[in-house]
Amino acid sequence: MAYDHKAIEKKWQRYWKQHKTFKATLDKDQKKYYALDMFPYPSGQGLHVGHPEGYTATDVMSRLKRMQGFNVLHPMGWDAFGLPAEQYALKTGHNPADFTNQNVDHFRDQIQSLGFSYDWDREVNTTDPNYYKWTQWIFEQLYKKGLAYEDEIMVNWAPDFMGGTVVANEEVVDGKTERGGYPVYRVPMRQWVLKITAYADRLIDDLDLVDWPESVKEMQRNWIGRSEGASVKFKVVGHDGVEIEVFTTRADTLFGASYVVLAPENELVDQLTTPEQKAAVDAYKEEVSRRSDLERTELSKEKTGVFTGAYVINPVNGEQLPIWTADYVLNSYGTGAVMAVPSGDQRDFEFATKFNLPITPVVEGFNGEEAYTEDGAHVNSGFLDGLNIKEAKAKMVEWLEEHDCGGKKVNYRLRDWIFSRQRYWGEPIPVIHWDDGTTSLVPEDELPLRLPETDNIEPSGTGESPLANIEDWVNVYDENGRHGKRETNTMPQWAGSSWYWLRYTDPTNDKEFASKEALDYWSPVDLYVGGAEHAVLHLLYARFWHKVLYDLGLVPTKEPFMKLVNQGMILGSNHEKMSKSKGNVVNPDDIVDQYGADTLRLYEMFMGPLEESVPWDEKGLHGSNKWVQRVWRLLMDDNNHLRDRVSTYNDGKLTKVYNQTVKKVTDDFERMHFNTAISQLMVFVNEAYKVDDLPLEYMKGFVKMIAPLMPHLAEELWSQFNESETITYQPWPTYDEKALVEDEVEMIVQVNGKVRAKIKMAKDADNKDVEDAALANEHVHSFVDGKDVKKVIVIPNRIVNIVVK
């Protein structure tokens, strides 16, 4: 009979749940392995077939490691705060908590139907007050360390969108919201900010400690954007004591500076603009306020700007340079000011060309048609003339330091992390602002500061979060009657995901976020699998929080995740990204119902290398299901009993291929090359179908090897061997090195250099025996009969060349 996936999968999922088969307990005598998935946001759409790919990969590794004797921690949880739930609630009038819990239940059911070996007793949910109590507690440690502060930050304010709200840079297109097309303005707003820049160097340097894809490391290095250069101070003409400081990586080009640019938001713009230019500058600032940072810094964008009417003195040659304001300079980068050298920077060149500003060549090679950025001898550069870039940089930095108008400096592209959102559905920030101007933290023994339940989650319209509407929650009094207001901004969705792997080690602890004992034993995460879209922000924020906790002596390792793997994307069958709008989304529930979870798991691991993006293919899925059935039929007869040919008798016919399979599958699983491991398992099954007797020892080993991939099928087959215990903790099969030795080789036989036959010989056979066998071969006869054999050349184990005349 065919394999009944529905009955068998339900049976074993029930068994695992009842027996808590995958429960992890701290055992210091056992070596540990911590396999972690990036926990999902439980959306209303539920799982799609892209989710199980990464989850199956970590599950294969978790099941392998258990069988190899490791104590495995393999947990799952929910990154459940987030904007979609709030937007859904606004649209429908439902409570975002109810909507989120309903989605979590649906996700959990879907994930459990796929047979993943999670320890569900460790499940976490970022919206659970018992969880976010510790998110708030960590925020308080950041605050005490001076790493959390308030600042006026330029934000994208859309007064007409959702009743007035802040939108991210990525959500602004042509000065309007991406959704709805509402006008967006750049306005300053009070925000909480985390000082991630204090860790910039360590976030770069410690990438050397982890086994991550080089592409991800490079993306993080570029995001942090450490650049070594110099600061240069320009005195402003007619303004005593006022200087404009710029950062440059090309101090050697200072002789070629022809103007200075201030970001429109730079406070010096209003201070320095002349009365004659004020109207033009104000109009320009208003225009720029409707552009996002992304739009402003597009390289292909038409350059815009306005002259302020003011000048600075170039310290190196005394020339007066005009001060312009232009949107391609961001106030959030460096000092919000740049020195412009049109002959050496393409943006400066385009700007100078448009506004007819001087362009002075300072390095040989400039052709007047575009900026020259290659190396060369300096010209028009006084004491730098004739030097190359490296020499000239060093000499100019020396000169700046000697003359007290600048010096060596390191700059970072990384900005501090804006940590507040004007939203309801997030962790409340545990801060009180008192009427006397002071700020205090909510006492630790009063945490969690719970998110108040309310029907009114409409935006406040003032830029504050909807929490500002809840008067009795916002207003507080201390024991002396002093009045204060709670912080109404909430934390971003990144907060809960910046430490969740630590909570999994001790998820029910109500005294601390996790005990030292649990953290010391389980840390760090050995394998972390998730999408490449999180290569920068989530991983950077998580590493930052981890390092802060390390500095506080609360975690034992400098880095949280030792090995990172990004699974590829599963595309639609048309090679496009799966999306509801394209109608190409495949629901895993349908696949599990029709073919079973083991088929889906097998197919997703067999599609191609784990890291590559591949299109969904129904034929491939069907082929995987056929192989599941083929494995079942190999061992089970039509009455669903173990076949008689499975016995303790071993005639040796499968010995070589079995040992080869154990070696290859073990090696490939360890390297997460699942597709090639499956190919080898298929080779073994093909060979097993060719022989009369199936040795019990080899069949047990084979079933163990398929267990990480197809656990339901493996458990059922294992039970058919009269085994009473789960296969989960059975020892992983080993191979015999001696059985892998090739005792026979295939040799090519050539006659006068042309291939005429192939012969099998014992490895390292005597040359005389090889000659005799070659000459005796029936395919060689016709080419040597009646001819004079001049000589026979034998290249051991490879070629026999017979020379005839």
Swiss-Prot record:
UniProt keyword list: Aminoacyl-tRNA synthetase, ATP-binding, Cytoplasm, Ligase, Nucleotide-binding, Protein biosynthesis
Q: Which Gene3D superfamilies match?
A: 3.10.20.590, HUPs, Isoleucyl-tRNA Synthetase, Domain 1
List the subcellular locations.
Answer: Cytoplasm
Q: What class of enzyme is it?
A: ligase
Taking the record's annotation, the residue ranges forming a coiled coil are: none
The record's section on InterPro entries has: aa-tRNA-synth_I_CS, aa-tRNA-synth_Ia, Leu-tRNA-ligase, Leu_tRNA-synth_edit, M/V/L/I-tRNA-synth_anticd-bd, Methionyl/Leucyl_tRNA_Synth, Rossmann-like_a/b/a_fold, tRNAsynth_Ia_anticodon-bd
Place the motif 'HIGH' region on the sequence.
40-51
Disulfide cross-links: none
Q: Which GO terms describe its molecular function?
A: aminoacyl-tRNA deacylase activity; ATP binding; leucine-tRNA ligase activity
Q: Which SUPFAM superfamilies match?
A: Anticodon-binding domain of a subclass of class I aminoacyl-tRNA synthetases, Nucleotidylyl transferase, ValRS/IleRS/LeuRS editing domain
* A family per Pfam: Anticodon_1
Query: Listed GO cellular component terms?
Result: cytosol
Secretion signal, residue range per the UniProt entry: none
Q: What is its EC number?
A: 6.1.1.4
Q: Known catalysed reaction(s)?
A: tRNA(Leu) + L-leucine + ATP = L-leucyl-tRNA(Leu) + AMP + diphosphate
Name of protein: Leucine--tRNA ligase
Q: Name the gene for this chain.
A: leuS
